Amino acid sequence: MAPDSGSFPEGPPLKLLPVDTRDRGTQRCRLGPTALRALGAHLGSAVKISLPDGGSCLCTAWPRRDGADGFVQLDPQCTSPGSAVGAPGSGGIINLNRLRLVPCPPLRSLAVWPELREQAGASGAPSPAAVLEAVQELLRNRPVSQGYVVAAPPGAPGPVAALHIVSGAPSPNPAGLVTPRTHISLSEVPPSEEEPQPEVPLGGLSEAADSLRELLRLPLRYPRALASLGLEVPRGVLLAGPPGVGKTQLVRAVARETGAELLAVSAPALQGARPGETEENVRRIFKRARELASRRPTLLFLDEVDALCPRRGGPHQAPESRVVAQVLTLLDGIGEDREVVVVGSTNRPDALDPALRRPGRFDREVVIGTPTLRQRKAILQVITSKMPISGQVDLNLLAEMTVGYVGADLTALCREAAMQALLHSEKNQDNPTIDETDFLEAFKKIQPSSFRSVIGVTDIKPVGWEQIGGLEDVKLKLKQSIEWPLKFPREFVRMGLTQPKGVLLYGPPGCAKTTLVRALATSCRCSFVSVSGADLFSPFVGDSEKILSQVFRQARANTPAIVFLDEIDSILGSRSISRTECNVQDRVLSVLLNELDGVGLKTIERRGSKSDQHGKCKQLEKNEELEFQEIFNSNVIVVAATNRPDVLDDALLRPGRLDKIIYIPPPDEKGRLSILKVCTKNTPMGPDVSLEKVAAETCFFSGADLGNLCKEAALLALQENGLEVTTVKQEHFLESLKTVKPSLSHKDLTLYKNLFQKKEFSILEDI
């Protein structure tokens, strides 16, 4: 039989058709050629299918007679107790990721509990020999699984109606094949009334599950073969990833799938108050794991292991050092027992003692990053599978809108949407339905957990490009630099272009530099972090650099993201050869340069697939294209604004860092007219108002000055005509021009023009 290949990630849906009458009682599953190739199945391979009702079915793979793709027909002769024994209803949908190949080795022995038919006119119960003969005939050359029920074909002769598989298949194997050499015995004790829990699909964790499954199956399933080959397999596995990605759920699911005994322990719960109590608790847990391993393979799971084994070396860490030494000793001794695998999980791998991460202890590390677009869609499919979702809800759109959300965040989002649906459906409380408006309301309350402690996260008011008057050339350059790479990554890859690392906006005050960045964040639909000097600077040495690194680390977890450094000249310093001391601004500048260069990117910050997606852009379908788009845009874009670019360090302005430098000029007459129209959009204007004349009279006015001019004109109208005034007249604008003076001057513009013409700023783009 084929080896267990794991669940197929994100497969196409298959329509469930009624079973062919010729296949009744054969335990066959008819699939199209595309599905067979995707599963890697051969003729007669054992396939485990998760049914829509929550149960599962065990059958053998066979090609469809008509060779059609997109359909599945199965004979549910061997199913879990929670499933219907009869044929499933037609018209259902089963995704390909619900089908999984399972190993099916020959069984040496098998114990079953027969369920007998009620035969009319029978003088007594059938003899055990007759029942055993019927059982052998029913199970001949069929795959079975422990805990499943095998139903007799309709109309089949014999006293047996169904068989409950009590024991037989080895625990690591989900299934086993009944052969003529299999010794079948009849159990006198009926199976437990407790139904096994249905298998829960691991949405978005298929890649990590495959890695962990491979590490666990080798020592648990083939210990003697590995010992004879002299191979040392990993005895410890460390799961690393941010909180809420599903590390604990992954371990429980893989342990259930491999048939291993799971001993789950929360590491903080082992801490004791008395000296030596923690070490005693740790020894007791490892002893319990060895006792369980004497009966079946055991998986010891230490959750939040960083709380138990922190980094040693501090002056007041003697108790922690003793605990770490005890854990190291026990991990070294666990290698003698090949039936125990230790798995630790943490969201702070750097806080672990380095001695735990050497070969022989936690020598394998599986990193579970923040879910990508495809993984978020898979998680949403699992969460909403049992929720009354309206047909108008687009999971693809929800996956696009949930950048930076982990599995726990998505669960909270769906739960909040269900609460909103319950509140809105007062008239139909018996059958509430969740629609897209409920999810939009939930978005206002549930934000990514990785952004809840980020410095500089602001709830910006959406600003459209049309709300900014003038500056059409500047808008186009910003779209080309930032928006186009985010929305059209295939075209950039095809032309060999890369996304800019940073953009610098400079110009006189009040010329809409900050407003342009807000409009950019609104149009790109990406995460937005605004950082100021008040957020960064701290009286403690090294704290400012640490805060800036934390901002970039958490922004990378929510990419695509824009980090906005407003008034960057007040945050960063300019290094000089003559100055030998290094102040805090120089150290912050050094951290920013390293972040822009990509130095110090940690493994735990990985997102998306390990495979290189850049060479596959031409063959991508829609979902794969969205996945490629997210992986391509996995960097953080830095947008800085200043009105003093002359004080910035030259190293910050070279290509590869702030490599796109855009000058934001004051508005010309056409731009001033556009700004006046935007500012007076909601103001009732009199018929005598000529905005063209006002624009001609406002030379050297910035955008902020024009907005202030419109406000002053409206206030003058209220002062002169009282609160009953309905319009603003031309005379109010002319009167306001006498009090509102321009903030710019010819000297200021000449200064910027001379600055632009300097040699070191020859790369600046005059607009």
UniProtKB/Swiss-Prot annotation:
Q: Which InterPro entries match?
A: AAA+_ATPase, AAA_ATPase_domain, AAA_lid_3, ATPase_AAA_core, ATPase_AAA_CS, P-loop_NTPase
- Could you say how this protein's activity is regulated? In the context of 55LCC heterohexameric ATPase complex, the ATPase activity is stimulated by DNA binding and inhibited in presence of RNA.
SMART domains the record matches: AAA
Top-rank EC class of the record's enzyme: hydrolase
Q: Which residues carry this modification: N-acetylmethionine?
A: 1
| PROSITE patterns (UniProt xref) | AAA
Q: Its Gene Ontology biological processes?
A: autophagosome maturation; mitotic spindle disassembly; proteasome-mediated ubiquitin-dependent protein catabolic process; retrograde protein transport, ER to cytosol; ribosomal large subunit biogenesis
Q: Which domain of life, per UniProt?
A: Eukaryota
Q: Which Gene3D superfamilies does this one have? A: 1.10.8.60, P-loop containing nucleotide triphosphate hydrolases (3.40.50.300)
Q: Where in the cell is it found?
A: Cytoplasm; Cytoplasm, Cytoskeleton, Spindle; Nucleus
Q: Pfam families annotated for this entry?
A: AAA (PF00004), AAA_lid_3 (PF17862)
Q: Which residues bind ATP 1?
A: 241-248
State the EC number(s). Answer: 3.6.4.10
Alphabetical UniProt keywords: Acetylation, ATP-binding, Cytoplasm, Cytoskeleton, Hydrolase, Nucleotide-binding, Nucleus, Repeat, Ribosome biogenesis
Reaction equations catalysed: ATP + H2O = ADP + phosphate + H(+)
Q: What's one GO MF term for it?
A: identical protein binding
What GO CC annotations are associated with the protein?
cytoplasm; cytosol; nucleus; spindle; VCP-NPL4-UFD1 AAA ATPase complex
Which residues participate in ATP 2 binding?
507-514
Q: Which family does it belong to?
A: Belongs to the AAA ATPase family. AFG2 subfamily.
Cross-referenced PANTHER family: AAA-FAMILY ATPASE, ATPASE FAMILY GENE 2 PROTEIN HOMOLOG B
What does the subunit comment say?
Part of the 55LCC heterohexameric ATPase complex composed at least of AIRIM, AFG2A, AFG2B and CINP. Associates with pre-60S ribosomal particles.
Function description: ATP-dependent chaperone part of the 55LCC heterohexameric ATPase complex which is chromatin-associated and promotes replisome proteostasis to maintain replication fork progression and genome stability. Required for replication fork progression, sister chromatid cohesion, and chromosome stability. The ATPase activity is specifically enhanced by replication fork DNA and is coupled to cysteine protease-dependent cleavage of replisome substrates in response to replication fork damage.
Q: What is this protein called?
A: ATPase family gene 2 protein homolog B
Which organism's genome codes for this protein?
Answer: Bos taurus (Bovine)
Tell me the gene name: AFG2B
